[in-house]
Regions:
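Short, internal strand/loop/helix patches
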Residues: 32-75, 79-80
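Non-globular targeting/processing and membrane-anchoring segments
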Residues: 5-10, 14, 82-138
């Protein structure tokens, strides 16, 4: 929410849940809406129940951060950043501050290159629909 407050007038944030509703019905629309309300998220929080977007992005875990940009001519979005929110992990005493994403956002907004030193996200794996696991998974 801090990132949304700091960048929301210049950036569109979107949340996406791609977990299987077959194996994880607790990740359904009502629960997502409750989660968004509990955390004060004002951005759209979408359900990818067919896992189409997750597969096209080659998502592996949750949370996984993607930052896209586009030029003023309306070109197709360009992936600028894929990685962790920050270095915080349960029990490591690192602050949950969004520093990695914040640095990438600042770079895109001022028109400089985003660092290629992008640390992969760590989290629970995407819960794929049975029999639909992508080839990179497992």
């Amino acid at each position: 929410t801090r990132l949304e407050n700091d960048f929301g007038s210049r950036v569109q944030f979107v949340g996406l849940s791609s977990n299987s509703l077959i194996t994880h019905p607790q990740d359904g629309p009502a629960q997502l809406a409750e989660q968004a309300q509990r955390h004060g998220w004002a951005f759209p929080y979408l359900l990818d129940d067919q896992q189409v977007l997750a597969k096209s992005l080659q998502a592996a875990c949750t949370p996984e951060i993607y930052l896209f940009s586009h030029d003023s001519k309306g070109s197709s979005p360009t992936l600028q950043y894929r990685g962790q929110l920050d270095s915080s992990r349960p029990g490591n005493d690192q602050p949950l501050d969004g520093s990695d994403l914040r640095a990438a956002l600042n770079a895109v907004l001022i028109g400089t290159s985003v660092s290629q030193n992008q640390v992969a996200s760590v989290g629970c794996n995407v819960k794929w629909n049975p029999g639909q696991e992508p080839e990179w998974f497992g």
